[in-house]
């Protein structure tokens, strides 16, 4: 008898959750076991009615009461304990970790400790605690499969996923669209509005990640992810601006061979690849018509995109705590920008100041990760007044 793969989707109402559920709708291979959401209870209720999960998780009791008034036949859990439970239950085969921000850290670790197949879209798990998460994955024989289009592309380009091929890799090249301001100089961006920063030319994404793409913070975080996912030193990671977002990443091998993964910009492709791995599943995506594209590439200038400069410096110095500071400061500053409390260029300007002024030892456990994160946010709040 055919047994469907049971999946928990952390962050079901976000853009990655949308694409994951779109893949599930197109196939008959997956059973939604649990769904979680932070604020959009109405959308979560609709998804519960459609997919009939056993569990749903919301952040607090008021949202639990609201969800229970909208749906029946689903057990509603609350808070961090609920997230960790639905990430580690014995019945679950796959956990899609798509919560935005450091809130995704604990449930991702819970999934790793339970030996789950983790589809990782939550950048912060690797950005803030990469050394700790990789240890948990190895120790508990879990699987960590990247969902970001760039890292999933690298994953597909590496022909031996047990990492025995890593000495053969000469360079991992991440591509970046460059965002909506890729052709503008910094002095032209003084009056950028949140609406302009969120208007990504290629991808449909949430507001926070759209701003991160425009500042190249998103790519800087992806550099950190690649560092941990593929066990390579910082000098073996490069970034190219590729406006068409067709070539998702490139791997250069020591014999001079280059292997790239290409496709139209559609998150269903990397998500389906991760969900079905080690096999491939059929999903509805637009075919890539090579005759319609002229692919272009250029170097990502560190002076123009200073987020990259900050992160590469942190990695070269093995200052992993500084990456926690960088990430926490960015989250606070992007929120301030979206709420029109600071100007666009201050996102990076203030982050440079904060990352330089705060110094912590590398964390030995996730409690220390959260402590560094908390102190950084408090410091940013004091700087912003």
Swiss-Prot record:
NADPH binds at residues 13-16, 40, 122, 124, 206. It catalyses: 2-C-methyl-D-erythritol 4-phosphate + NADP(+) = 1-deoxy-D-xylulose 5-phosphate + NADPH + H(+). One of its GO terms (biological process) is isopentenyl diphosphate biosynthetic process, methylerythritol 4-phosphate pathway involved in terpenoid biosynthetic process. Its EC number is 1.1.1.267. The keyword Secreted does not apply. It is an enzyme of class 1 (oxidoreductase). Keywords: Isoprene biosynthesis, Manganese, Metal-binding, NADP, Oxidoreductase. Pathway: Isoprenoid biosynthesis; isopentenyl diphosphate biosynthesis via DXP pathway; isopentenyl diphosphate from 1-deoxy-D-xylulose 5-phosphate: step 1/6. NCBIfam families: Dxr. PANTHER family: 1-DEOXY-D-XYLULOSE 5-PHOSPHATE REDUCTOISOMERASE, 1-DEOXY-D-XYLULOSE 5-PHOSPHATE REDUCTOISOMERASE, CHLOROPLASTIC. Catalyzes the NADPH-dependent rearrangement and reduction of 1-deoxy-D-xylulose-5-phosphate (DXP) to 2-C-methyl-D-erythritol 4-phosphate (MEP). Belongs to the DXR family. This is 1-deoxy-D-xylulose 5-phosphate reductoisomerase. It comes from Francisella tularensis subsp. holarctica (strain LVS). The lineage of its organism: Bacteria, Pseudomonadati, Pseudomonadota, Gammaproteobacteria, Thiotrichales. The gene is dxr.
């Amino acid at each position: 008898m055919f047994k469907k793969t049971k999946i928990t989707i952390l962050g079901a109402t976000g853009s990655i959750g949308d694409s994951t559920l779109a893949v599930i709708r197109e196939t008959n291979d997956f059973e939604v076991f649990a769904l979680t959401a932070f604020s959009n209870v109405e959308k979560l209720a609709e998804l519960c009615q459609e997919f009939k999960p056993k569990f749903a998780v919301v952040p607090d009791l008021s949202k639990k009461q609201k969800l229970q008034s909208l749906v029946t036949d689903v057990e509603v859990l609350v808070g961090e304990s609920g997230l960790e439970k639905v990430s580690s239950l014995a019945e679950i085969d796959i956990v899609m970790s798509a919560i935005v921000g450091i809130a995704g850290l604990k449930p991702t670790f819970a999934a790793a400790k339970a030996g789950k197949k983790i589809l990782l879209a939550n950048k912060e798990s690797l950005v803030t605690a990469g050394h700790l998460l990789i240890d948990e994955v190895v120790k508990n024989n879990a699987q960590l499969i990247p969902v970001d289009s760039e890292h999933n592309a690298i994953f597909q380009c590496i022909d031996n996923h047990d990492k025995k091929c890593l000495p053969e890799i000469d360079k991992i090249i991440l591509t970046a669209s460059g965002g909506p301001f890729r052709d503008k100089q910094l002095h032209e961006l003084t009056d950028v509005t949140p609406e302009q920063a969120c208007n990504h030319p290629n991808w449909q994404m949430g507001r926070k990640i759209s701003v991160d793409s425009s500042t190249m913070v998103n790519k800087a975080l992806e550099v950190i992810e690649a560092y941990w996912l593929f066990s390579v030193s910082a000098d073996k990671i490069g970034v190219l601006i590729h406006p068409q977002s067709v070539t998702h990443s490139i791997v250069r091998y020591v014999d001079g061979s280059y292997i790239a993964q290409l496709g139209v910009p559609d998150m269903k492709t990397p998500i389906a690849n991760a969900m079905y791995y080690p096999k491939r599943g059929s999903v509805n995506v637009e075919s890539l018509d090579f005759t319609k594209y002229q692919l272009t590439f250029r170097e990502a200038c560190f002076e123009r995109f200073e987020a990259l400069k900050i992160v590469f410096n942190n990695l070269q110095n093995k200052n992993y705590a500084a990456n926690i500071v960088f990430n926490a400061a960015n989250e606070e500053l992007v929120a301030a920008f979206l709420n029109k409390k600071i100007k666009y260029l201050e996102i990076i300007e203030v982050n440079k100041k904060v990352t330089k002024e705060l110094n912590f030892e590398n964390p030995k456990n996730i409690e220390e990760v959260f402590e560094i994160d908390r102190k950084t946010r408090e410091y940013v709040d004091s700087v912003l007044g």
